[in-house]
Amino acid sequence: MLVLFETSGGFALFKVLDEGKLSNVEDLGTEFYSAESARRMGLHKFLKNNCDDGEILAVADPKLGDIITEKLDIECVHNDAVMELLRGVRSQLTELLSGLDDNDLAPVSLELSHILARYKLKITSDKVETMIILSISLLDDLDKELNTYTTSVCELYGLHFPELANIVQDNILYAKVVKLMGNRINAATLDFSEILADEVEAELKEASMVSTRTEVSDLDLMHIQELCDQVLSIAEDKTLLCDDLKNKMNKIAPNLTALVGELVGARLISHCGSLWNLSKLPWSTIQILGAEKTLYKALKTKQATPKYGLIYHAPLVRQAAPENKGKIARSLAAKSALAIRCDAFGNGQDNTMGVESRLKLEARLRNLEGGDLGACEEEEEVNDKDTKKEADDEEEPKTEECSKKRKKEAELETVEDPAKKSKQEGVTGLLLLMLLISLIYFFSVNQLLW
């Protein structure tokens, strides 16, 4: 029997000198305890040149054995005894093969592993899309947590200095001011130029001197400042997460990001599960994506369906006038459908298509909101200049035209009067006829009753 042994460097054939030992599988491993006992099996050349007719070939992979049997007409066997035999050969391979060292086999194994990795391991966008979905979910959680903490800071510090909420309306700046100031008495001696503008700083210092609210202990101020640290830490994490999300969206869906922004694009991908699923949707579905509950409720109650869903938060839709939001949302959804398919099915695409579509939509928005009005104003100015120059010449024709119009209106009135009269007479006749019928019916019913 011959044994085919596979390595990263090639193939090796071993011949079983004593096939009787294969009958006892448990004692087969004792033949490979030392290199001297394992070396008794000789080394042969490659398979086709050294396998004689009638030889049985032991292989580790049954699929490989089937291929060898089909191609070379060599009988192959695979069982527990063969696996134990190959395990012993593997343990003493460097001693069985002359001139082979572990250092020689390691580079070949590394190269083979790299080749297999190229075929088996493939970096796809699914992993990145999963990170986008998790990032947008984490961003929503950070927003909720940030709102909760900032509300707590405003409520707690408002007992001590309520005027600060009206002076500093930004939550992050509010937390920075509270952390730096502590007690409101310290505001007069502190420098807020790195945080606030000069006017706001002067107003803050003036309000701190006038405020007469309750005092707080140092322990309470310390807890409030620790809460401010949490607010600033969450805000910093949110900024880093937004930057990372923007980079990922520019790599996965650059055209969609150029049209609707990274946040809206990420929410659309998260709503559908992947960019591939989003690319299968028509533009009409993309337009109302995220407003499914409102849509089903409107269809059930037979009311007006929603015009937009998640796409409402896109910059182009937000900056449009209320009467133009529906038109811009419809156009943006159509362009977004093309951009999504370009990102999903294109290889190495940039954001050229998305930028061009955005410029077209911005031009359309300008035309809807003010382009036509400007053209009309120019025409009116030109007409005013012409009328000023030719005022004297046009006075007589205008009076003649006015008199002609009055004559035509008078003629139309005279023509329309008989028609109006005939219509009125017809209506009165119908009313009289209905009155007579009702009277006849009334008298007939009374006679039957009597």
UniProtKB/Swiss-Prot annotation:
> Listed GO molecular functions?
snoRNA binding
* Cell wall biogenesis/degradation among keywords: no
Coarse class of the protein's main subcellular location:
nucleus
Q: Give disulfide pairs as residue numbers.
A: none
Keyword Ribosomal protein attached: no
A GO BP entry is:
ribosome biogenesis
Q: Where are the transmembrane segments?
A: none
Name listed for the protein in its UniProt record: Putative nucleolar protein 5-3
Name the gene behind this protein: NOP5-3
